[in-house]
Regions:
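Activation/maturation switch segments at domain boundaries
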Residues: 1-8, 12, 16, 20, ...
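N-terminal leader/targeting and assembly helices and adjacent pre-domain segments
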Residues: 1-86, 94, 98, 165, ...
């Protein structure tokens, strides 16, 4: 692991410099440097992965592709590093969140939609309590005005798949939302 590598490199460098001091990996400055390095590596790795995945999804969207074609693109990107179900989870999570974000933005721009209604898949794979901390069965049918958040899932979400939600609430979510149109007062 990285801490072991830092320790080994530190000890080797002290030996190379012929300094007879024990390398202290628990020294506050060393711990701080280790944490900063880990944070930087994680951030850069995530940024790089995000950029590459964004390109994959943008290309798929431009081509009008669905989840099966996206799975092929993800398989080519990840190779053997991810299983089929992991790739499907990535594709489903990203397309669900993206589609629902697009719906919400369209409603905001429409001037005829006043709110939304949460629509769950309602099958044996739909999240429900007590099996899950998040309840998409109970969320089914919840209505909110534009600008308000859905809360019945166990968290406040702007839409199904909202990335501000916890992983357990949005990963593999298959829910969508339906518009509530302003009634004509004729």
């Amino acid at each position: 692991d990285l801490l072991r590598l830092i320790t080994l490199a530190g000890k080797e460098e002290l030996a190379r410099l012929r300094i007879e001091v024990d390398f202290d990996v628990e020294r506050p400055e060393t711990v701080a440097a280790y944490r900063e390095l880990l944070s930087s590596i994680a951030t850069k790795t995530n940024e790089t992965t995000w950029d590459e995945l964004s390109d994959i999804f943008e290309d798929a969207e431009r081509e009008g592709e669905g989840i099966p074609a996206i799975l092929e693109r993800l398989s080519a990107y990840y190779g053997d590093r991810k299983s089929e179900w992991q790739l499907e989870r990535i594709a489903r999570t990203t397309t669900t969140g993206g589609a629902n974000a697009g719906l919400l933005e369209a409603w905001r721009q429409s001037e005829v939609v006043e709110g939304g209604e949460w629509v769950s898949a309602l099958d044996d794979r739909t999240r429900t309590s007590p099996e899950s901390d998040f309840d998409h069965v109970h969320a089914h049918g919840e209505t909110v005005r534009l600008g308000e958040l859905y809360v019945r899932t166990g968290e406040s979400l702007a839409y199904p798949g909202d990335p501000s939600g916890s992983p357990g609430n949005i990963i593999n979510c298959r829910c969508t939302q339906a518009p509530i149109v302003i009634e004509d007062e004729e």
